[in-house]
Amino acid sequence: MSYKVVVVGATGNVGREILNILDEREFPIAEIAALASRKSLGTEVSFGDKTLKTNDLASFDFAGWDMALFAVGSEATKEYAPKAAAAGCIVIDNSSLYRYDPEVPLIVPEVNADAIFECHKKNIIANPNCSTAQMVVALKPLHDRAKIKRVVVSTYQSVSGAGKEGIDELWDQTKSIYNPVDNKPPTKFTKQIAFNVIPHIDVFLDSGDTKEEWKMVAETKKIIDSE
């Protein structure tokens, strides 16, 4: 059996990597569509030996397509994911929008694959934060043997999590360290990121935690306790 697959946000770093993985793993695809915003319309992306031209997300008809892999921000997901789901297309969302929705399963296949059957409520499956996904794979067998009460974890995350702007800022600052004439102050991050570690991802909450820290707690509980 093969599937008709849509990749939403195909011109972004994550969207391009999704296309690469689908090809590398020889996912059974009958037809594939690459979608992007109007400003990226017509941009070409690679899919194996093929080149795909991006279509306009705003005008795309999801009817008749089996699944849509969303690799865009929460705002675009909020607008278009329900339309895709209503058209009968299973949405797999990489943003944080649906992660905490009680009617949307938050899936890490190695941990709670059976929870996927709950996706019929909204036709949407959520993908967790990358740090959460790695952590719960290690925690699950321990939790099964002896219920975990507390976890102390440190994560060190790449600037790619901040998108292309984060990657560009790291590159520019790294160059400026070796060529001080071309010194560029931070704009994407609160401090210099080159050769540095900043204990600040996303916004600070009233509790004093960052939203990234809160995400890991909430997502871990939802994934491990989904059974």
Model-derived segments and their meaning:
Residues 1-193, 208, 226:
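N-terminal Rossmann-like NAD(P) cofactor-binding subdomain of oxidoreductases
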Residues 193-227:
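Oxyanion-binding "anion nests"
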